[in-house]
Amino acid sequence: MTIMSSLAGAGRGVVNTIGGAAQGINSVKSSADRNAALVSNTGSTDSIDATRSSISKGDAKSAELDGTANEENGLLRESSMLAGFEDKKEALSNQIVASKIRNSVVQF
């Protein structure tokens, strides 16, 4: 091996090292540029921020209406139950009256 080939081998090693470092720097820069482009191209969140409060208000109103509906359903069930009791009382009263009429007819 001659001095020239040793120098050439050393030169190639230096060039390869410098080239590898340059590629690494370029990869890091490309990645940073890509991330910056992604962030800058996503647009603003103004429209999301604008709708967030109305969605929150809508959710609150919906919860309020659900509570009112539950109360009304409870009152409706209670009214239906009371009406059923009244019907049963009326039917029982009718049976008592009919029984008294039958008993009075039999006695005459």
Swiss-Prot record:
GO annotation, cellular component aspect:
extracellular region; pilus
**Residue span of region Disordered:** 41-73
| UniProt entry tagged with the keyword Secreted | yes
What role is this protein assigned? Major structural protein of the hrp pilus, which is a component of the type III secretion system (T3SS, Hrp secretion system) required for effector protein delivery, parasitism, and pathogenicity. The hrp pilus functions as a conduit for protein delivery into the host cell. Also, affects the expression of T3SS-associated genes. Required for full expression of genes that encode regulatory, secretion, and effector proteins of the T3SS. HrpA-mediated gene regulation apparently is through effect on the mRNA level of HrpR and HrpS.
Protein name per the record: Hrp pili protein HrpA
Which residue windows does the record flag with biased composition (Polar residues)? 41-56
Recite the UniProt keywords alphabetically.
Fimbrium, Secreted, Virulence
Subcellular location, record wording: Secreted; Fimbrium
Primary gene name: hrpA
Q: Which family does it belong to?
A: Belongs to the HrpA type 1 family.
**Organism, scientific name:** Pseudomonas syringae pv. syringae
